[in-house]
């Protein structure tokens, strides 16, 4: 659900023209009078603690190099799902990912199967819009469904310090405190991230913004994730008919384990 992680890992969207971002300076507001950096750290830690292992609905969008990625999904206790759309260079890729227990499932159009999963053009045409299954213990394919269980949500929200306060805002009708941190790209550079939590009440995240000052230009990623329905636990059903993805992908694409 994190835009940067979705682009560099989960959706393998480098093939769609979205690459690792470079650092963009972020102008931040001064902390409230009398507040120290440790206070921002404390609020960030309180937000992760409040999340715990709660389910949630999320919507995210990211842009870079003229490519866009839109994702919507739900994380539950034993199952979860997300649907994504990648648009780049006149090509639209659509894919749905689902996890039920210890098995992951993906279904996508031919473009998504070829560019995001790595199937051949012939395989992508044959298996387009059908369900492909794999064990979540598979190192590599597991990223396709990472963050879709409620026990994984807090980890998806992790950002690095030092933490500072940004400018307070009204987000989704709520007065919110902005906590600024960063995440690292694959190249080792850092991208600023702003996490918005309610100013009062339980600090369950409302929104997360990556590179708030960027506009999805040639070298800078910009993304947002919004959260709602904290505590939900939607149950996803396993598809009735599937094909093993492990039998289709090149052996070098992942570390194969039993199952799938």
PLM features per residue range, with description:
Residues 2-74, 79, 234-237, 241-243, ...:
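N-terminal leader/targeting segments and the immediate start of mature chains
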Residues 54-62, 67-88, 93-97, 102-106, ...:
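One face of beta-strands
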Residues 107-149:
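Acidic/charged, solvent-exposed loop-and-adjacent secondary-structure segments enriched in E/D, K/R, S/T
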Residues 150-191:
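A mid-sequence, solvent-exposed acidic-amphipathic segment
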Residues 174-241:
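Gly/Pro-enriched, hydrophobic low-complexity segments
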């Amino acid at each position: 659900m994190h835009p940067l992680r979705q682009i560099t890992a989960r959706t393998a969207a480098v093939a769609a023209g979205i690459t690792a971002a470079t650092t963009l300076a972020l102008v931040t507001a001064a902390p409230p009078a009398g507040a120290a950096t440790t206070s921002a750290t404390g609020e960030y830690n309180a937000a992760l603690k409040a999340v715990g292992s709660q389910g949630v609905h999320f919507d995210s969008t990211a842009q870079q190099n003229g490519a866009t990625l839109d994702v919507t999904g739900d994380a539950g206790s034993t199952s979860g799902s997300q649907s994504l759309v990648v648009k780049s260079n006149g090509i639209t890729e659509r894919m749905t990912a689902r996890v039920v227990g210890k098995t992951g499932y993906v279904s996508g159009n031919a473009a998504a199967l070829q560019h995001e999963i790595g199937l051949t053009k012939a395989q992508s045409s044959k298996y387009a819009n059908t369900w492909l299954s794999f064990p979540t213990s598979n190192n590599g394919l597991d990223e396709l469904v990472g963050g879709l269980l409620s026990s994984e949500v807090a980890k998806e929200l992790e950002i690095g310090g030092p933490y500072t306060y940004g400018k307070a805002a009204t987000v989704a009708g709520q007065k919110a405190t902005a906590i600024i941190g960063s995440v690292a790209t694959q190249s080792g550079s850092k991208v600023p991230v702003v996490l918005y939590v309610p100013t009062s009440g339980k600090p369950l995240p409302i929104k997360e913004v990556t590179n708030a000052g960027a506009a999805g230009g040639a070298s800078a990623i910009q993304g947002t994730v919004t959260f709602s329905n904290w505590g939900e636990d939607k149950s996803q059903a396993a598809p009735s008919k599937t094909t093993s993805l492990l039998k289709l992908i090149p052996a070098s694409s992942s570390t194969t384990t039993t199952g799938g």
